[in-house]
Regions:
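Catalytic cores of TIM-barrel enzymes
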Residues: 1-186
């Protein structure tokens, strides 16, 4: 029997505490700062502990890595904390496969831990990298963790369709130099 994950109960808590005006004000303040304009005050980013969490299950990072429902559920606790904090944060979630996410496109695998973020098991030799062709990475949507990312993203979209104030953002793709370091090592 599949374990019941109380995702819908958590979504109900979020919807009940949502303050549209509060979120819109936070977004406006952040936009003003990004556009080098002066807001009424600098955005404040606050959140705190959620008392209800003690009555709900929790899932470690390994559980989340292999289950989109557990990952989204865990991330939504942060969104509830932001909403209750009534600061200028924007509640948001992402598929969180760790910094090695894009490196898996090159055929690298990550070690998955219960208590910390995933980490690459190995690197590619420079000689192999130098011989790679674009065709080696195609079709990109079938490589590495990209199919899982798409599946998790589709799941998130479906579950969040009635709460558009929770934004989705990109997984940790790293910059080009960090990605090169992850793939090639030192």
């Amino acid at each position: 029997m599949k374990e019941e994950i109380p995702l819908d109960k958590l979504i109900d808590l979020i919807i009940n505490d949502y303050d549209r005006e509060r979120i819109e004000t936070g977004i406006k303040r952040q936009i003003m700062v990004q556009e080098n304009k002066e807001p009424d005050y600098l955005p404040l980013f606050l959140h705190g502990k959620i008392p209800e969490m003690d009555r709900f299950p929790s899932y470690d990072r390994r559980d989340q890595f292999y289950d989109p429902e557990k990952m989204l559920y865990t991330l939504l606790w942060g969104c509830l904390s932001i909403i209750r904090g009534k600061a200028d944060n924007i509640p948001c979630v992402r598929v969180n496969f760790g910094t090695g996410f894009l490196a898996t496109v090159f055929g690298l695998e990550q070690q998955i831990f219960p208590d910390k973020m995933p980490w690459l098991k190995s690197h590619l030799e420079i000689e192999k990298i130098m011989k790679m062709q674009i065709e080696d990475l195609e079709p990109l949507e079938d490589k590495g963790l990209i199919p899982q990312w798409k599946r998790y993203t589709d799941f998130y979209r479906e579950k969040l369709k009635d709460i558009p104030f929770i934004k989705m953002y990109l997984p940790d793709t790293q910059g080009v130099f960090d990605l090169a370091h992850l793939v090639a090592g030192d």
